[in-house]
Amino acid sequence: MTMDLPTTDDRPVWDLWLSMYHAPAVTAAIELDVFEALATAPATHEELARRLKLSERATEIVLPLFAALGLLSRYDGRYQLSDVARLYLLRGSPYDWGGLLNRMGPSSPHHAAIREALKGERASTTGAPGDRPSDAWAAGHVEIEQARVIAAFMHSHSIAAALGMARNVDFSGVRRLLDVGGGSGCFCIALAQRIPQLRCTIMELPAMCEVAKEYVSAAGLADRIETGAVDMFRQEWPRDHDAMFFSNILHDWDFPTCARLLAKAHAALAPGGRVFIHESLLDDSGAGPLTTATFSLVMLLGTQGRQFTYAELAKLLGDAGFTDVGATPSYGYYSVVRATRR
């Protein structure tokens, strides 16, 4: 079954989904005196984390969100209050919204999760470490029931982006593509529909491979898309592909782990091989965009990673031995960062 590109992109649905995190992030920050501290003096995320004894990673993630919400601005690496925050979020202001916001905050489960993440006490909305979605991949095992849930979740918010990417990004010259952590296989499906000569491999954990086969079969592409049961951290990667593809994979992991994955991609490619990274990119300014900054907060709560700027991905790729780095907007809030193996 061939799927057509939707007539409008899915940004409004992304906005709707992620808006549920905005107020809880603000109320958690109010409770932890983030805005009061910045009223005293502008600060980098490292300085603010030290001043308030907060998690540096969590602070780095939430400050761009507050900038995108118009509550902070960033100058010379330091964040400072906007007029809106100074008027309406400080306890000493006659216009303080605290009477409403402080009452509303505890009613949201996201408030507690974000507060605890900022304090460095909790890394997941789902409970203790071990319950995060990325932990199954870190452990190298996922049960078939969990694989079905994860695949459905990922497929639902990725299929439109996959179809758009297949239309808008240049994959010319690619004959065999390895989709690292390919989930339901929606990106391979979209690319195979678009490029008749392309053959793809979905590299996943065994249970995810079984689920991906169902999606591929339903699309009528089992003759050109195969699966490979490989633990991306512990096993060697296939070396018979001329391109590697990562979608929403690197944002699950810290920088050393991302460097390790890109090094494995480099080792598995011949010179001239290509890598494609599909992510929603943060602005280099540290002020959003709003939906991507909120998505980064979701990564804080459910993974070990966060969203990247283009410059950060370009450096990771360069350090791994890739060259000719560039980026192309692909669909909705997404872009594809591409590079070539030396």
For each predicted feature, which ranges?
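Conserved Class I S-adenosyl-L-methionine-dependent methyltransferase catalytic core
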Residues: 4, 10-32, 36-42, 50-51, ...
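Alpha-helical subdomain
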Residues: 1-74, 171, 176-342
